């Protein structure tokens, strides 16, 4: 018989830096999950992605065991890293903060493809370009 799913918890945690402090501790503690075990496993699995924020979906079962799936970093984090900026523009339609080439957008779209609902790479690129535009990043050929 399969284990009964108690809940799913969605968090965004810096890669390799999960600690029992908030937001991880309270989110897992209220469901009786072994927080240190999660932190250790998450940090091992994400050590190679240091500096990025990694979304994680934690499935908690009725016997207090858990499994988790890590996803690709948010498009905005990847765009900021590629452009070398700290944050997007406060007024993206008037004030531009960076310029990226289309091939950089393509690499980000390829990386995000498993988590996007886009049917093709071109559609994924348009999605990433829209995120870039809303952050004040100009995309050029």
Swiss-Prot record:
Pfam family, one: Ribosomal_L11
PTM field: One or more lysine residues are methylated.
Keyword terms, alphabetized: Methylation, Ribonucleoprotein, Ribosomal protein, RNA-binding, rRNA-binding
GO biological process, alphabetically ordered: translation
MF annotations from Gene Ontology: large ribosomal subunit rRNA binding; structural constituent of ribosome
InterPro entries xrefs: Ribosomal_uL11, Ribosomal_uL11_bac-typ, Ribosomal_uL11_C, Ribosomal_uL11_C_sf, Ribosomal_uL11_CS, Ribosomal_uL11_N, Ribosomal_uL11_N_sf
One GO CC term, this protein: cytosolic large ribosomal subunit
The keyword S-adenosyl-L-methionine is assigned to this record: no
Keyword Transmembrane helix carried by entry: no
UniProt family annotation: Belongs to the universal ribosomal protein uL11 family.
Quaternary assembly: Part of the ribosomal stalk of the 50S ribosomal subunit. Interacts with L10 and the large rRNA to form the base of the stalk. L10 forms an elongated spine to which L12 dimers bind in a sequential fashion forming a multimeric L10(L12)X complex.
Record function comment: Forms part of the ribosomal stalk which helps the ribosome interact with GTP-bound translation factors.
Name of the protein in its database record: Large ribosomal subunit protein uL11
Species whose genome carries this gene: Caldicellulosiruptor bescii (strain ATCC BAA-1888 / DSM 6725 / KCTC 15123 / Z-1320) (Anaerocellum thermophilum)
